């Protein structure tokens, strides 16, 4: 395939928060100076930024890993570590971002300058100045920085065009685009000449302008991936008006009306919302001898399949070769665009809600399993977050972590599972003895 890349899978890692510091104030004439360790800085976010100058996802073919910087550690004198700069990654307009693991749509990036945080940096760990209490005025406790969010993302690029040209291969879509715009698509008398979307700007005689995309040729079964399949259909999702190009000369030996039905069936099979878009039927190649007779037959069959109260789709006879009927077609297209709103690609329920970084009540705080060597293994998102933020170089921090586990009910749950005094318990690579 050509150098157009419309999907990519990448990994992003936000920066970790900086570690908090344990320090004490030691100055002349300041007795009992107390704790003086500052907090760590926030880790950098990974932020996607829409750049209208980009046209493909090609950059992500060569660079698939994006990692933001971590925050600085806390310092003495109660000074906080510096927060890290966000890592800003440029993406083209029309990029849909999904979580690769769940398939959930995170965001749809369509406006120049639009930003979205795809991975949140961890907060800085607290220094010992934060843990001072009347009972413990000089704590030797600090927190490690919170790990930054890490995830795998699936990117899809759907080109931004107001009007999409659809039709069987070799019905004249590329020729039409080259005539009505300054685009220079590859044109040839064989199927799938167009293997990537071509985009061009149209200016009508009345001065209105809109973007037109000549999309890869569609065949029956495309919605199931046949031919160029869903690569084609992905791009038509963003168009507001569809120009359905029909070869009225039947030069390929197919019936024009059967072509019309087959293409609409594929659009409906892929996504029912594609059929909500207004469609203009473009009867192309009207300069050929058989075309007029075929057009009359087409109109007759079309009318037979609509009841008397339904409005028939507009049909515009044209010739991309001789430019017959083009001005009328473009004016009608511009008029239809003016009264057609944009279509949402995804229901709001499919989009990721505003990020929430607490712990849900239903979410298990921890899980217990047992290894083959009889070691009890603790896991779970909340537990691992507390574990990763514990400074095991300080006894008071370790004791604080033990109290947190007890408060979560870990001791009680281990006892209920049959843990005995002296049994080994493992969290990550850290092991300790269970004390009953």
Curated annotation (Swiss-Prot):
Residues in Obg domain copies: 2-160
Record-stated family: Belongs to the TRAFAC class OBG-HflX-like GTPase superfamily. OBG GTPase family.
Domain of life according to the entry: Bacteria
Species assigned in the record: Streptococcus pneumoniae (strain CGSP14)
Protein name: GTPase Obg
Assigned EC number: 3.6.5.-
Known function: An essential GTPase which binds GTP, GDP and possibly (p)ppGpp with moderate affinity, with high nucleotide exchange rates and a fairly low GTP hydrolysis rate. Plays a role in control of the cell cycle, stress response, ribosome biogenesis and in those bacteria that undergo differentiation, in morphogenesis control.
MF-aspect GO terms: GTP binding; GTPase activity; magnesium ion binding
Gene Ontology cellular component terms for the protein in this record: cytoplasm
UniProt-listed Pfam families: DUF1967 (PF09269), GTP1_OBG (PF01018), MMR_HSR1 (PF01926)
Domain OBG-type G per the UniProt entry, residue ranges: 161-338
Cited CDD domains: Obg
Residue ranges that the Swiss-Prot or TrEMBL entry lists as coiled coil: none
PANTHER family found in the cross-reference section: DEVELOPMENTALLY REGULATED GTP-BINDING PROTEIN-RELATED, MITOCHONDRIAL RIBOSOME-ASSOCIATED GTPASE 2
Keyword Membrane: no
UniProt key word DNA repair: no
InterPro entries: G_OBG, GTP-bd, GTP-bd_Obg/CgtA, GTP-bd_prot_GTP1/OBG_C_sf, GTP1-OBG_CS, GTP1_OBG_dom, GTP1_OBG_dom_sf, OBG_GTPase
Binding site for GTP: 167-174, 192-196, 214-217, 284-287, 319-321
Cofactor(s) needed for function: Mg(2+)
Signal peptide span: none
Subunit structure: Monomer.
Domain OCT residue range list: 358-436
Keywords, sorted A to Z: Cytoplasm, GTP-binding, Hydrolase, Magnesium, Metal-binding, Nucleotide-binding
Lineage: Bacteria, Bacillati, Bacillota, Bacilli, Lactobacillales
Enzyme class, spelled out: hydrolase
Localization (cell): Cytoplasm
């Amino acid at each position: 395939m050509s150098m157009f890349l419309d999907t990519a899978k990448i990994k992003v890692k936000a920066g970790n928060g900086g570690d908090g510091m344990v320090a004490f104030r030691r100055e002349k004439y300041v007795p009992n100076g107390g704790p003086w360790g500052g907090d760590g800085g926030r880790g950098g976010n990974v932020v996607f930024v829409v750049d209208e100058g980009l046209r493909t996802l090609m950059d992500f073919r060569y660079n698939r890993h994006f990692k933001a910087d971590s925050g600085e550690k806390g310092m003495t004198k109660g000074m906080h570590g510096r927060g890290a700069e966000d890592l800003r990654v440029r993406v083209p307009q029309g990029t849909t971002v999904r979580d690769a693991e769940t398939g959930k749509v995170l965001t749809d990036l369509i406006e120049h300058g639009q930003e979205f945080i795809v991975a949140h940096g961890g907060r800085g760990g607290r220094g010992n100045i934060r843990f001072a209490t009347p009972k413990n005025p000089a704590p030797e406790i600090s927190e490690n920085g919170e790990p930054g969010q890490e995830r795998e993302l699936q990117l899809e690029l759907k080109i931004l065009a107001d009007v999409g040209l659809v039709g069987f291969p070799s019905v004249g879509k590329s020729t039409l685009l080259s005539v009505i715009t300054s685009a220079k698509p590859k044109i040839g008398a064989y199927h799938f000449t167009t293997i990537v979307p071509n985009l061009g700007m149209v200016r009508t005689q009345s001065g209105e302008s809109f973007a037109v995309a000549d999309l890869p040729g569609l065949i029956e079964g495309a919605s199931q991936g046949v031919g160029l399949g869903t690569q084609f259909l992905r791009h038509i999702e963003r168009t507001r008006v569809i120009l359905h190009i029909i070869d009225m000369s039947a030069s390929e030996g197919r019936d024009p009306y059967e072509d019309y039905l087959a293409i609409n069936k594929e659009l409906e099979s892929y996504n029912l919302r594609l059929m909500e878009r207004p469609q203009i039927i473009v009867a192309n190649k009207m300069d050929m001898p058989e075309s007029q007779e075929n057009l009359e037959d087409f109109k007759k069959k079309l009318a037979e399949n609509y009841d008397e109260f339904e409005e028939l789709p507009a049909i515009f006879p044209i010739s991309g070769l001789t430019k017959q009927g083009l001005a009328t077609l473009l004016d009608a297209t511009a008029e239809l665009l003016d009264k057609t709103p944009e279509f949402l690609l995804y229901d709001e329920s499919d989009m990721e809600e505003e990020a929430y970084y607490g712990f849900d009540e239903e979410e298990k705080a921890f899980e217990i399993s047992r290894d083959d060597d009889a070691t009890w293994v603790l896991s779970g998102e909340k537990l691992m977050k507390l574990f990763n933020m514990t400074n095991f170089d300080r006894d008071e921090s370790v004791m604080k972590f033990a109290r947190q586990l007890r408060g979560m009910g870990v001791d009680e749950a281990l006892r209920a599972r049959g843990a005995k005094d002296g049994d080994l318990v493992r969290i990550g690579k850290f092991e300790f003895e269970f004390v009953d």
